[in-house]
């Protein structure tokens, strides 16, 4: 479709009207360029897909919404906007689209959040009830759906009242009533525990109401994980050919895709035996009480028992083999080099893939048959079986995918990382098997790039080391396929608005020197606090261990520090804003996650402290396997993995400072390697152009090291 004169005029008119809605609106050349580039791509005038880096201040959200809505209307398609996290998803849904509705009054939009963000009205009814008899219909859930105390029951009753009177849409983020994670776990549900159309509350369920709204909406705000799942199952979203897709925070897409395709399952032999026994009893109950018209051959008891016995024997053999690779009687992990399994293990995985797929098919057949049963049956008993069969289906579906992935030598032209872990839970050791592909470009090509005609991938940071090459390698987007890559200029004058400060540290921030380095950092930080030049400050660390050591050096300043983990992030930011607005000094302290999505302007944040260059951890099975694979191709893992990732992290961290034309301040980076190592210049060259200063560091007093036991963390 060509960009007609009428379409261009519509886009221009909306853009002009938008300027009147936003106080102190500043027209910016990069924003106009982005609107034009997005329009040309979505209309099919230029290229297949567009990856466009839009630095802070460009106004990227409105720059893709305006042309996206115009072209979606012209082509009678749905515009799907996908983000990486709920916070940005909600911002677009609750702020940006309502703003556009002021200039496009008939605009219809909705949001597609994950099932776990919505309340389950069935569970809410049970938890809000004061009469045990009212919960009888919910007894089939096999879950504890009773309030822990009277206060919790009253809170649930208030939530139910708000839901029933349409004061609340059922989204966790859209109520002011405090809901802790434990309560929300019981209030919400997942796919395996949802009765879907069989549920009494189906028509009024917030999750399904939102899903039905998608059919009528012109704009749907989703998230990357949901989009990936929808493209895989051809559900929720419109047909790929009938939608336009914008992937905001697009730099997260490869990781989200990899997470979605990672498979893990418990394979502890006694536990597995129990699951198989429960399934055979479940099938027997279905055959006895809700016999299907056509009997599946595998449902015949003798055949099913033999099938499950073979499956168990293979699992038991796999347990014995995997345990030989790990020290006995303790938590442990074993990774298979280059993802290559011994022949014996590979043969077991291939057979397990077939056997679990057959059980998945059997569970699906029974589930479909149960869902079609009429009201002449005992509804409570029927629903209990539906839930149990749904959970069995979920288990065998995951197992089937796991063993299929384990049977593959490669995925997207790269090895599949495969490893086993032994973990202790409630005094018992459990064995798990894990698989994940190093590259997901083939899957992204199949699900997105080849299926949807035109896609916009955007973010404030898409490049690392001034190059799109890492994004291209990880995502599968490529110029020879007609994809375009554009980096817009920043609208800010960084050279005048701020500077980079690299203190003359005596040591590098290595593990061996960490204590002395932290002591020097704390001394310089204390000097900055005492100067009282800055009200709002941010301190970012590469690890929780380093952050805690730093806090040990500044205990006397603790009241001014708002530390990640003390409270939810949004509350820390709210408190920080209030303090600075009242003329008080306030310091946010956190890890890399604090470097993304934090938007504090002017005095709210005028000094950013960065502990060190944040190279990615090199001890995860995925990173180690990727390193082995790169070396086998005569590629240098540091250049391909570590340096681009560190550059990306540093760009994001530095990007917290200048958020508007009125912002000013300093970025303090406590890492001399930026000036002493060859790669340091490349990292600095990828940052906005700031003047650089190198002040002296006051003497730091190194505290005596205390032996601390590092907490074990699950690695991927």
Curated annotation (Swiss-Prot):
Disulfide feature: none
Cross-referenced Pfam families: DEAD, DEAD_2, Helicase_C_2
Enzyme Commission number: 5.6.2.3
Residue window of motif DEAH box: 131-134, 248-251
Cofactor note: Binds 1 [4Fe-4S] cluster.
Swiss-Prot/TrEMBL GO biological process terms: DNA repair; SOS response
Keywords (A to Z) from UniProt: 4Fe-4S, ATP-binding, DNA-binding, Helicase, Hydrolase, Iron, Iron-sulfur, Isomerase, Metal-binding, Nucleotide-binding
Residues reported in the UniProt entry to bind [4Fe-4S] cluster: 120, 194, 199, 205
Domain Helicase C-terminal: 517-698
Cofactor(s) needed: [4Fe-4S] cluster
Keyword Cell membrane in annotation: no
Top-tier EC class: isomerase
Reaction(s) the record says it catalyses: Couples ATP hydrolysis with the unwinding of duplex DNA at the replication fork by translocating in the 5'-3' direction. This creates two antiparallel DNA single strands (ssDNA). The leading ssDNA polymer is the template for DNA polymerase III holoenzyme which synthesizes a continuous strand; ATP + H2O = ADP + phosphate + H(+)
Protein residues bound to ATP: 54-61
Helicase ATP-binding domain: residues covered: 17-294
NCBIfam families listed in its UniProt record: PRK11747.1 (NF008729)
Its job: DNA-dependent ATPase and 5'-3' DNA helicase. Unwinds D-loops, R-loops, forked DNA and G-quadruplex DNA.
Family to which this protein belongs: Belongs to the helicase family. DinG subfamily. Type 1 sub-subfamily.
Protein name: ATP-dependent DNA helicase DinG
Species the sequence originates in: Escherichia coli O157:H7
Name of the encoding gene: dinG
């Amino acid at each position: 479709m060509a960009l007609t004169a009428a379409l261009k005029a519509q886009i221009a008119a909306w853009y002009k009207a938008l300027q009147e809605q936003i106080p102190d609106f500043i027209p910016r050349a990069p924003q106009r360029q982005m609107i034009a580039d997005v329009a040309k791509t979505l209309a099919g005038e230029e290229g297949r897909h567009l990856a466009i880096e839009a630095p802070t201040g460009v106004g990227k959200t409105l720059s893709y919404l305006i042309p996206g809505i115009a072209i979606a209307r012209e082509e009678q398609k749905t515009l799907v906007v996908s983000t990486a996290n709920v916070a940005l998803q909600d911002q677009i849904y609750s702020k940006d689209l309502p703003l556009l509705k002021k200039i496009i009054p008939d605009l219809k939009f909705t949001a597609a959040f994950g099932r776990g963000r919505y309340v389950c009205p069935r569970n809410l009814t049970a938890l809000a009830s004061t009469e045990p008899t009212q919960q009888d219909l919910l007894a089939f859930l096999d879950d504890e759906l009773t309030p822990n105390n009277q206060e919790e029951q009253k809170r649930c009753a208030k939530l139910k009242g708000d839901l029933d009177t349409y004061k609340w849409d059922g989204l966790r983020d859209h109520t002011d009533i405090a809901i802790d994670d434990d309560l929300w776990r019981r209030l919400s549900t997942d796919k395996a525990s949802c009765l879907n159309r069989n549920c009494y509350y189906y028509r009024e369920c917030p999750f399904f109401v939102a899903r039905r709204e998608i059919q009528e909406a012109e704009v749907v705000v989703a998230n990357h994980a949901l989009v990936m799942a929808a493209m895989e199952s051809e559900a929720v979203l419109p047909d790929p050919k009938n939608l336009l897709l914008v992937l905001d925070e697009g730099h997260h897409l490869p990781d989200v895709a990899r997470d979605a395709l990672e498979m893990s399952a418990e394979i502890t032999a006694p536990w597995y035996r129990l699951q198989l026994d429960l399934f055979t009893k479940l099938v027997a109950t279905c055959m006895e009480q809700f016999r299907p018209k056509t009997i599946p051959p595998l449902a015949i008891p003798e055949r099913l028992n033999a099938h499950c016995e073979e499956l168990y024997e293979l699992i038991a053999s796999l347990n014995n083999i995997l345990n030989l690779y790990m020290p006995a009687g303790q938590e442990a992990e074993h990774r298979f080099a280059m993802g290559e399994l011994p022949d014996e293990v590979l043969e077991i995985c291939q057979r397990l893939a077939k056997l679990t797929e057959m059980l998945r098919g059997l569970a699906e057949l029974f589930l479909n048959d149960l869902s079609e049963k009429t009201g002449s049956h005992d509804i409570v008993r029927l629903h209990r079986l539906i839930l149990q069969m749904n959970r069995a289906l979920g288990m065998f579906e995951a197992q089937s995918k796991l063993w299929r992935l384990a049977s593959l030598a490669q995925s997207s032209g790269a090895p599949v990382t495969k490893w086993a872990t032994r973990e202790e839970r409630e005094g018992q050791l459990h064995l798990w098997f894990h698989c994940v592909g190093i590259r997901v470009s083939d899957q992204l090509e199949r699900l997105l790039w080849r299926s949807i005609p035109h896609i916009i991938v955007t973010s404030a940071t898409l490049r690392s080391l001034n190059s799109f090459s890492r994004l291209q390698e990880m995502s599968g987007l490529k110029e020879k396929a007609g994809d375009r890559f554009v980096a817009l200029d920043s609208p800010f004058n960084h050279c005048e608005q701020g500077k980079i400060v690299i203190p003359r540290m005596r040591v590098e921030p290595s593990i061996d020197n960490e204590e002395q380095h932290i002591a020097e950092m704390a001394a310089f930080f204390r000097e900055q606090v005492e100067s009282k030049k800055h009200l709002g400050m941010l301190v970012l660390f590469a690890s929780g261990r380093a952050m805690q050591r730093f806090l040990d050096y500044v205990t006397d300043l603790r009241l001014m520090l708002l530390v990640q983990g003390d409270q939810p992030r949004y509350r820390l930011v709210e408190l920080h804003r209030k303090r600075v607005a009242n003329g008080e000094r306030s310091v946010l302290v956190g890890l890399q996650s604090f470097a993304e999505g934090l938007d504090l302007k002017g005095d709210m944040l005028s000094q950013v402290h960065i502990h060190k260059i944040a190279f990615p951890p090199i001890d995860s099975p995925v990173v180690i396997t990727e390193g082995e694979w790169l070396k086998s191709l005569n590629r240098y893992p540091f250049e391909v993995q570590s340096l681009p990732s560190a550059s990306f992290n540093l760009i994001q961290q530095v990007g917290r400072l200048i958020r508007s034309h009125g912002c000013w301040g300093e970025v303090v980076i406590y890492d001399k390697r930026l000036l002493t190592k060859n790669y340091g210049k490349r990292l600095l060259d990828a940052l906005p152009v700031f003047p650089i200063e190198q002040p002296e560091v006051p003497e730091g007093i190194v505290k005596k090291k205390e032996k601390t036991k590092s907490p074990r963390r699950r690695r991927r």
